Amino acid sequence: MSKSLKRIAPDVILGKDVIIFDFVNLYGCKIGDETRIGTFVEIQKGVSIGKRCKIQSHSFICEGVTIEDEVMVA
């Protein structure tokens, strides 16, 4: 039996080919195509992340932030 190590709220919108690692909390956000989200990341409601972004481990993206396409957050 596999236990999920991710918390993804039902109102999260995920694009195509998004990669989400373990220990991630996503709440009411929009994640663009081909974006990678590392371990121990929290993304709050109202956040919009563009296509082909990299959100590195231990990042915290607060409510209402917009991140354009092809951005790396470390």
Please annotate each region the language model reported.
Residues 4, 9-10, 15-16, 21-22, ...:
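Left-handed beta-helix
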